[in-house]
Amino acid sequence: LKLFRARYDDGVKIFYDFDSEILDCFVIINIFQPLIENYFEHAYNSNRNDNCLWLRGKKVKEDMLCLSVDDNGMGMTPESIQILQMSLNSMASDENDSYGLRNLHQRIRLYYGKDYGLTITSNSHGGLSVVIHIRRIIDC
């Protein structure tokens, strides 16, 4: 994130909200990276002075964590979100697909199981929310 903030002249406010009880939990490497890259590629607007990115994490069940990345970018139509969500489960490669999101979704499912992965929705800020559900594993 420091590299992105330096590259974009601190043109984005980043907020963190992680429950303390999840700080000792294991997550696969670079779990946020493709989501943050997508924000700067598709949602960041250099003409705005109110670009925001929220990174959150909490325990939603004894055995499940919910991590999320929310932005206040331009968002997507419901139809586009539905197509993107369906493409996450596709093994077919298409240059127009979001390879980073699909790769992350599939890595999560391989590591944590088929009940876990990414969910993409619109949010109240006008942008997108990408929610990551993973199994809670205490770091040893």
State each model region's role.
Residues 1-133:
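Two-component histidine phosphotransfer core
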Residues 135-139:
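Two-component histidine kinase transmitter core
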